[in-house]
């Protein structure tokens, strides 16, 4: 069984795209998805963790780390292992950042690796995806709609490759990617325009 842990993503569409892109590589009965929240059913999650052969965490990265909810969850899992729980699954991660370079997720990836080491869980492989805001902010511009589509196509192959590692339960080198169809300068320019637009909207509301 493959357990997908939803650690939260900037855009629901991105989250669905990532899981759906990998889903075709697993039989439906193998795949269980659980969202990490403060109110999640811990007993059920423990059963999933014990039964899973592979665990895939998908999450956003904020200031070099995953969210506090995800960190709290990992700490709780670590304590459960210390308390006698056994997790034989291989751990994989797909981390998103709105910054251009996927390498910006590398520190958060190390946090997850350290968690696996402390919890005696085998690390499988990490995929860090940069430029995560591009598609969802494409707006009405035909140019940016096209660029958004190109980014989806760009991510797709890497997500499917990650799914193959998960399916075969093998380890690999972490991979960090970004939308090469758009330059870093152009991406930052667009992000700055979005921030200014949001600020103007907030001022207008006040």
Region locations from a protein language model:
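N-terminal beta1-alpha1 ligand-phosphate binding loop
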Residues: 1-29
């Amino acid at each position: 069984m493959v357990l997908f842990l939803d650690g939260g993503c900037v855009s629901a569409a991105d989250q669905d795209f990532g899981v759906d892109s990998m889903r075709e590589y697993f039989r439906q009965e193998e795949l269980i998805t659980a969202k990490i929240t403060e109110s999640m059913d811990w007993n059920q999650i423990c059963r999933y963790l014990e039964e899973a052969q592979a665990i895939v965490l998908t999450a956003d990265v904020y200031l070099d780390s995953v969210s506090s909810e995800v960190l709290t969850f990992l700490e709780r899992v670590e304590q459960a292992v210390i308390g006698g729980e056994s997790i034989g699954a291989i751990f994989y991660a797909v981390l998103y950042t709105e910054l251009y370079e996927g390498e910006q997720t590398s520190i958060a990836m190390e946090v997850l690796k350290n968690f696996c080491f402390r919890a005696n869980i085998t690390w499988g492989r990490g995929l860090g995806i940069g430029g995560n805001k591009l598609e969802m902010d494409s707006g009405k511009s035909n140019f940016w709609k096209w660029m958004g589509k190109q980014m989806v196509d760009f991510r797709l192959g890497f997500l499917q490759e990650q799914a193959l590692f998960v399916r075969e339960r093998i380890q690999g080198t972490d991979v960090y990617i970004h939308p090469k169809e758009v330059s870093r300068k152009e991406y930052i320019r667009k992000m700055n325009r979005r921030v200014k637009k949001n600020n103007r909207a907030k001022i207008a509301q006040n």
